[in-house]
């Protein structure tokens, strides 16, 4: 790049076309990159990003009041602190571990097999648009105990809500659509909440309806916000991670052969995908006080964006970080799906992703089904791979061919 990285905008189309081409220069020359148009900083070095995420007293989630609450209908888990955060996080976690996870595994398998079935005889599919997006929504609806016949409208409304949260800026028309989608979800979910209070089952909404915080039942508003929180967090990254993993395994045939021969390597492939191409690229924080980041003094109330993709490619944290390698010794596989993960795809600190273990289980199950059912899987001839997204990022499509059933 001939132009100074300090004069370059990470909000430009040029950057969004391939952000990975600029991460190294950002880390080396401008690790605390200022974007004047939004008066915010973008932080790219691993140790700076990890420090920010692990110090919520200084780097707060206050910005989510504007970035999330209008469409989430209330505070999300990442905004909560102390006893409230611990208690409500524990309630949600109950649906992602132990017996609850065992209960969800057959549903994950059933969704994957049912959605793949129409494509198996054809011998080709788009793993993003034919399968992944619908799969992620259907699994989340099963977890919540919602009627999957409504998955198309839930998917549409979810997309509108996600656009609000993951857009650096929105047009008035796009903002109005996002708020409308949030209202539609609210109208859809409120009767479900009231019904589950009377007739609870084993689903997450029932768990929320029958749980207490400080001796009191959660309000309908609290439950609605937590449902929307789960819907967004469980759906948005899942389809992207699966498609990214399959694509990079296909581009590294020796590693694909290793995985096909030894399925115990699938968790390594998932973890390396999360490091190499994290679906969540940006995590915002707002300063509670003047502080110094990477040698730069930043004023109170300023918003900083942690660049997860750039941090996960930092050579100070990982050897040969720009190489996809499921066998890397510094992957930290034992903790890769927890708050102690070396990679930062799940965040870090007290606000790390509550569903990390569930995400691993979900993607491992569906990846094995894809590899079993789609024998001799390969990219379609003349397929042109592309990714999109600044805040969250994943393949636009993934056209694969395979030996039909």
Curated annotation (Swiss-Prot):
Cross-referenced InterPro entries: CypX (IPR030904), Cyt_P450 (IPR001128), Cyt_P450_B (IPR002397), Cyt_P450_CS (IPR017972), Cyt_P450_sf (IPR036396)
Tagged with keyword Signal: no
Residues noted as binding heme in the record, renumbered to the chain: 62, 229, 285, 353
Cofactor: heme
Keywords: Heme, Iron, Metal-binding, Monooxygenase, Oxidoreductase
Subunit structure: Homodimer.
One Pfam family named in its UniProt record: p450
Any one of the GO BP annotations: pigment biosynthetic process
Protein name from the UniProt record: Pulcherriminic acid synthase
PANTHER family: P450, PUTATIVE (EUROFUNG)-RELATED, PULCHERRIMINIC ACID SYNTHASE
Keyword Lipid biosynthesis: no
PROSITE patterns per record: CYTOCHROME_P450
EC number, as in UniProt: 1.14.15.13
Family to which this protein belongs: Belongs to the cytochrome P450 family.
Function of the protein: Involved in the biosynthesis of pulcherrimin, a red extracellular pigment. Catalyzes the oxidation of cyclo(L-Leu-L-Leu) (cLL) to yield pulcherriminic acid which forms pulcherrimin via a nonenzymic reaction with Fe(3+). Substrates with small alkyl groups (cAA, cLG, cLP) exhibit weaker binding to CYP134A1, but substrates with larger hydrophobic side chains bind in a similar regime to cLL.
Reaction(s) the record says it catalyses: cyclo(L-leucyl-L-leucyl) + 6 reduced [2Fe-2S]-[ferredoxin] + 3 O2 + 4 H(+) = pulcherriminic acid + 6 oxidized [2Fe-2S]-[ferredoxin] + 4 H2O
Single GO molecular function: monooxygenase activity
